[in-house]
Design a protein with these regions (language model features):
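Charge-dense, helix-prone N-terminal extensions
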Residues: 2-140
Length: 140
């Protein structure tokens, strides 16, 4: 896959504080990774729906966009410089993490997991049930 070199540097370089992100995203039941060339972005999806998106903003800053609840995200935006209303997506439903700025790992892990949970909650029941079976029996 031809990932953008700058985005790759922040996510996949073992010196990066954020090198855990791809593994965490892919550890979630039913999650897949894909590179969307037309967006020059790495997408993490569950049942076809995006829960995480790695891209650059117009200034070339690497970002991780995550689905979020505005009530939960707003205090985090105020507390951490690395977190802000999402770039190029609904500011009401998405948060951006600047990958070139620091944010505590436990906060990032929580935001990724919460993003996944919000997306899964919006899936039809049949698809949610399938993901529940996958999480309890990953060999299915």
């Amino acid at each position: 896959m031809g990932y953008n070199a700058k985005v790759s540097l922040y996510l996949w370089d073992m010196r990066s504080d954020y090198s855990f992100i791809p593994d965490l995203c892919l550890s979630l039941p039913g999650a897949i990774e894909e590179y969307k060339e037309t967006w020059d972005a790495v997408l993490y999806r569950v049942q076809g729906r995006i829960f995480a998106l790695v891209l650059e903003d117009h200034d070339g800053n690497p970002l991780l966009n995550l689905k979020s609840d505005l009530r939960e995200a707003t205090p985090l935006h105020a507390r951490y410089d690395a977190l802000m209303p999402a770039y190029h997506m609904s500011k009401k439903h998405w948060t951006s993490l600047r990958l070139d700025l620091d944010c505590p790992e436990e906060i990032v892990r929580h935001l990724i997991t919460r993003s996944y949970e919000l997306v899964v909650a919006g899936l039809p029941r049949r698809e949610r049930d399938l993901l529940t079976r996958l999480s309890t029996n990953p060999d299915q």
